Regions:
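Charge-rich cytosolic interhelical loops and cytosolic tails of multi-pass membrane proteins
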Residues: 1-4, 107-174, 243-250
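N-terminal first transmembrane alpha-helix
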Residues: 1-114, 200-210
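Cytosolic/matrix-facing juxtamembrane and C-terminal tails of multi-pass cellular membrane proteins
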Residues: 1-16, 150, 164, 220-251
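Alpha-helical membrane-embedded segments
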Residues: 55, 108-125, 178-189, 201-225
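Inner-leaflet juxtamembrane helices
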Residues: 67-72, 127-136, 223-237
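Hydrophobic alpha-helical membrane segments
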Residues: 82-91, 171-191
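Hydrophobic alpha-helical transmembrane segments in multi-pass integral membrane proteins
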Residues: 88-98, 151-160, 186-190
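Loop-to-transmembrane boundary segments
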Residues: 7-24, 152-185
């Protein structure tokens, strides 16, 4: 397996990404502002998205300034989990919609709890796959290169790490899609009378986007965030304690 240790490190782009993400989040906030005018999401949601993105962009800029030289992987790992904030806000549309529609409280709580249970289950299974793979020394050596002084993350191993688990909610599979979307369908079914009693257009859009967004939430939280937390935060800290060497990003 040929791997280039000198390809661009994500930290080198955090300054520009901080600005780009602010633009993307502004567009997301604009979409939620429009939805809020139709009463399908909370009126304050778009403001919260913008405020949270300002915080995320500030953290990214501080990280770029403070960690560009040390290049500590576990620090970059934490920041990298914040970087997908705009996409997480899109993926959580189903949650924001469920919180806003006037369905019975018991049904609302039950459906949201069921959805988060599915997310937690998927994340746990992916984490179990990663923990099992990390027990194999050759896997760890493939991901982290020992240059004698430090352990260096091989940037080109993203696809290799993804291949350590076959669990991907975005893969086509009728049974899995039906299973994942059943809780949402129950809540949306309970909202039928409300939907057809008002302007149907915004609700139809939110329902369609919610059904698409839930598998996206599963993928972001259950795959991406678990991967980042395990291979860029937990495992680097564990390796630093075990070897006495810093785990860093390549220059």
């Amino acid at each position: 397996m040929t791997i280039d240790l000198d390809d661009a490190s994500p930290i080198d782009f955090h300054g520009k990404l901080a600005v780009l993400e602010l633009v993307v989040s502004s567009l997301v906030a604009g979409g939620y502002f429009v939805f809020s005018q139709f009463g399908v999401v909370a009126a304050s949601l778009w403001k919260l998205v913008l405020a949270a993105q300002l915080f995320v962009s500030t953290v990214m800029i501080l990280h770029y300034v403070m960690n560009r030289r040390p290049r500590r992987l576990w620090v970059e790992g934490i920041v990298s989990m914040l970087m997908l904030f705009p996409f997480l806000m899109i993926a959580l549309l189903w949650l924001f919609y469920l919180l806003s529609i006037p369905i019975p409280l018991v049904l609302k709580v039950s459906v949201i709890a069921a959805c988060f249970a599915l997310i937690a289950r998927h994340a746990f299974l992916v984490l179990s796959d990663f923990r099992r793979a990390a027990k194999i020394e050759s896997v760890v050596q493939t991901i982290y290169h020992d240059n004698g002084k430090n352990l260096v993350l091989r940037h080109s191993c993203g696809g290799y790490i993804d291949g350590l688990t076959a669990r991907n909610p975005l893969k086509p599979g009728v049974l899995s899609v039906v299973a994942y979307l059943t809780p949402l369908a129950a809540a949306l079914g309970g909202n039928v009378n409300h939907v057809f009693g008002e302007n149907i257009g915004p609700h139809v859009l939110c329902i369609a986007f919610s059904l698409l967004a839930f598998p996206m939430t599963l993928s972001l939280v259950g795959n991406f965030y678990v991967r980042q937390l395990f291979f860029r935060v937990y495992l680097p800290l564990k390796l630093e304690r075990r070897t006495g060497k810093r785990v860093i990003l390549a220059q």
